[in-house]
């Protein structure tokens, strides 16, 4: 399973992972009842992708709200990216958010502090 697509629901984000382009997109709210069930396929996909060599991976985030378990899952994904970056794999994150939602901007900044790879935070008007 090289492509991954998970439709958005009222409590889960749209997730799309494209093997050919090396782009993983997550958009929307994330407060699922079972974040493990939602994010484990994503973590598995990222692990498989990063194990395939030195191909660039870009994570594009437009997350509006994350509950605690979703934050932990995103940390797991960023840890995989950090490990790959340490091995010379080109990885990047771009987190776009509504400028009126300061809480999400602050959360993105907190994540960025723990990352040594390129991590852009873009406030949209």
Q: Which residues are covered by each model-predicted region?
A:
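Structural motif
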Residues: 23, 57-58
């Amino acid at each position: 399973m090289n492509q991954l697509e998970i439709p958005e629901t009222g409590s889960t984000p749209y997730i799309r992972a494209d093997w050919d382009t090396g782009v993983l997109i997550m958009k929307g709210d994330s407060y699922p009842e079972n974040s493990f069930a939602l994010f484990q396929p994503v973590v598995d996909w990222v692990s498989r992708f990063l194990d395939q060599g030195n191909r660039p991976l870009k994570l594009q985030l437009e997350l509006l709200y994350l509950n605690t378990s979703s934050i932990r899952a995103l940390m797991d994904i960023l840890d995989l990216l950090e490990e790959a970056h340490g091995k010379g794999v080109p990885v990047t994150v771009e987190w776009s958010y509504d400028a009126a939602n300061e809480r999400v901007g602050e959360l993105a900044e907190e994540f960025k502090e723990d990352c040594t790879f390129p991590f852009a935070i873009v406030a949209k008007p």
